[in-house]
UniProtKB/Swiss-Prot annotation:
Protein's UniProt name: Ribonuclease P protein component
One term under GO cellular component: ribonuclease P complex
Superkingdom as given in the UniProt entry: Bacteria
Catalytic activity entry: Endonucleolytic cleavage of RNA, removing 5'-extranucleotides from tRNA precursor
EC number(s) per entry: 3.1.26.5
SUPFAM superfamilies: Ribosomal protein S5 domain 2-like
Pfam families: Ribonuclease_P (PF00825)
Oligomeric and partner information: Consists of a catalytic RNA component (M1 or rnpB) and a protein subunit.
Alphabetically ordered keywords of this record: Endonuclease, Hydrolase, Nuclease, RNA-binding, tRNA processing
Gene this protein is translated from: rnpA
Length: 113
């Protein structure tokens, strides 16, 4: 099983935001940016507007687990950043999974065009 690696540095997040491709729906925004041989890395950004710390951490844990569970579906040597929108605060695991794949499909369509 491959290792789950998180983005930590602010400069890495800025590169993904500036040069990456994005897709969004009501609940999530997903950025994808190819990195040069650094492997598959994930970052999560959840604003304080989403809710209190308990809510934000629950959403981060849900997304992290979804990414870990479906690790083989994500491209190698790419950075992914998920931005959780305020409307996601009451979503459960299965709903977030559905929203994640919806955004993933939009991103793949956008890349093909």
């Amino acid at each position: 099983m491959k290792k789950f690696v998180s983005l930590k540095k602010n400069s890495d997040f800025r590169n993904v935001y500036r040069f990456g491709v994005s897709a969004a729906n009501r609940y999530l925004v997903l950025y994808k940016f190819p990195n040069k041989g650094l492997g598959r890395r994930f970052g999560f950004s959840i604003s304080k507007k989403v809710g209190k710390a308990v809510c934000r951490n629950r959403l981060r844990r849900i997304l992290k687990e979804l990414c870990r569970f479906h690790l083989d579906r994500f491209s190698d040597d790419c950075d992914f950043v998920f931005i959780v929108r305020q409307t996601s605060s009451d979503q459960d695991f299965h709903q977030m999974e559905k929203h994640m794949w919806h955004v993933w499909g939009k991103l793949n369509k956008q890349e093909k065009n």
